[in-house]
Amino acid sequence: MNPLWQQYIQILNQVVKPALGCTEPIAAAYASAVARTLLGIVPEAISVQVSDNLYKNSMGVYVPGTGKIGLAIAAAAGAIAGNAEAGLEVLAAITPEQVAQAQDLIDAGKVKVERTETEEFIYCCVTLKAGEQEALVKICGGHTLIAEKRLNGEPVFTADNAQSAATGSICDGIDISIKSIYQFAQEVPFDQIKFILKASELNGKLSDEGMAKPYGLEVGRTMKSGIAAGIIGEDLLNKIVMLTAAASDARMGGANLPAMSNLGSGNQGIAATIPVVLTAQCYNVTEEKLARALIMSHLGAIYIKSHYPPLSAFCGNTVTSAAASMAMVYIAGGSFEQSCFAIQNVISDSSGMVCDGAKASCAMKVSTSSSAAVRSFLMALNSQNVSGQGIIATDVEKTIKNIGKMILNGMSSTDITIIDIMST
């Protein structure tokens, strides 16, 4: 196989993976679970220090299996019931009795959560104490990327390179572009990419869950009621928005089902998957073509997001939906040029959407960007595109660089302001 394609598959396997619950509080649960394996006994006290961005994305979202919100319950649950071997599915087997144990620790004032100053966007340091014993685990640069382990002050493990880059480093040193992703998705042997179909299965189950039960703001179920009442129609646009939002409703509402995430985000994994799957159903394409489209969507999203920090004031659903729109054009039989038009159109439409933390209303943002993806792919098929206007360049690669520049140079103060507003 082409060595470059092997690198692309490695990237996908590394950052497109199942995640149970919003990944920021789950990072704390995972760190606690790893620390518990070091400590060897149930902790009497837990201390959690996190970056501002991780704090922001943990303030308003339910931790799966607990029915509760926030970093304190995530860390306590991880220490009591977490499976350190399960990664982002660390809390998959938690029981109501264990949730009660975790809550007892919190009620006794034994769980302390603090923000800490750090240059890292993803940072979580958990310390567990029991008597004279103490275990520390530090996560840095990625939701399950362990930088350091200590037992009673003595180093047990230190990563060779604990510091993450200021921007997503997943694509650093790799020859990758929208054109190469498009070619890879079209030409790579099907058996090498079949694994991506798991995204359709997992995120489809979340969508079904969100439609069946009243999670969060019930964005998906509200649209279903509107269809039943004859207020809106059940066309492709509304079906995509409804079912994509429903999956996010369930995820943000603490459903005990994993999402297939994209670069650490379950919602963005949903946005990269469900619109593509529903478009494939509409056009009645083969399973192989669906897999190729999902590869295009997920890897395209990863590539665009590698141009800016993993957590920021920018809502990543925008560029994820841009990649999904590119894949939707491919499914519909459009050209590479038209796929680029779709990316340009979505970014032009939705690039002003900010991230003000993970919470129930994320389902609305997912629905907004997914709606833009549908409009944009239809416009692209008609060869209508935004070009040379605002931050949208005449070339898609330049537009992607412009997004990175806007976020890195223009939105750092926005992020600080958002966190300040949320913390007062």
Curated annotation (Swiss-Prot):
It comes from the Bacteria. One of its GO terms (biological process) is L-cysteine catabolic process to pyruvate. InterPro entries: Ser_deHydtase-like_asu, UPF0597. GO terms for molecular function: L-cysteine desulfhydrase activity. Belongs to the UPF0597 family. This is UPF0597 protein Sputcn32_1209. The lineage of its organism: Bacteria, Pseudomonadati, Pseudomonadota, Gammaproteobacteria, Alteromonadales.
